[in-house]
């Protein structure tokens, strides 16, 4: 029996910008709202920067800080008017991650829902990939 072949054609497209279909990091509406609120009080800053540091009982921990500019090797995520910069060292650890902001009666914090994490410590502040 003869096998069928599907024909494929490739066309060059000019004047079209290719955009990634998925950002390294996505933000929930509550994270966007909180970042906007925080930046309102920091007019000299243009966004927040996410980094990763070696610490804790599982090895790595995320850091968040205000930033006045994009670093040379930072990846920029823009969502709903909010700019988040990802340090080079953190870029691979954040692929596919959702950044959320959670507030309850006792605490409020940014939470990184990361599908790549293999393990976390009991308090949830450090992780390994």
Swiss-Prot record:
Pfam families, sorted: Fe-S_biosyn
PROSITE patterns to which the protein is assigned, alphabetical: HESB
Keywords for this protein: Iron, Iron-sulfur, Metal-binding, Mitochondrion, Transit peptide
Main subcellular location of this protein, as a coarse class: mitochondrion
An annotated Gene Ontology molecular function: 2 iron, 2 sulfur cluster binding
PANTHER family per record: IRON-SULFUR CLUSTER ASSEMBLY 1 HOMOLOG, MITOCHONDRIAL, IRON-SULFUR CLUSTER ASSEMBLY PROTEIN
Designated name of the protein: Iron-sulfur cluster assembly 1 homolog, mitochondrial
Native organism: Gallus gallus
């Amino acid at each position: 029996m003869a096998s069928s072949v599907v024909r494929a054609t490739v066309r060059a497209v000019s004047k079209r910008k290719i955009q990634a279909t998925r950002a390294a990091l996505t933000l929930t509406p509550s994270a966007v709202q909180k970042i906007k609120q925080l930046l309102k009080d920091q007019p000299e800053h243009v966004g927040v920067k996410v980094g990763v540091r070696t610490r804790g009982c599982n090895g790595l921990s995320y850091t968040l800080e205000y930033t006045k500019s994009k670093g040379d090797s930072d990846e920029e995520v823009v969502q709903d008017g909010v700019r988040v910069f990802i340090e080079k060292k953190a870029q691979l650890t954040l692929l596919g991650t959702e950044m959320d902001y959670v507030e309850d009666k006792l605490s409020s914090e940014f939470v990184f829902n990361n599908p790549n994490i293999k393990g976390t410590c009991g308090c949830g502040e450090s992780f390994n990939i």
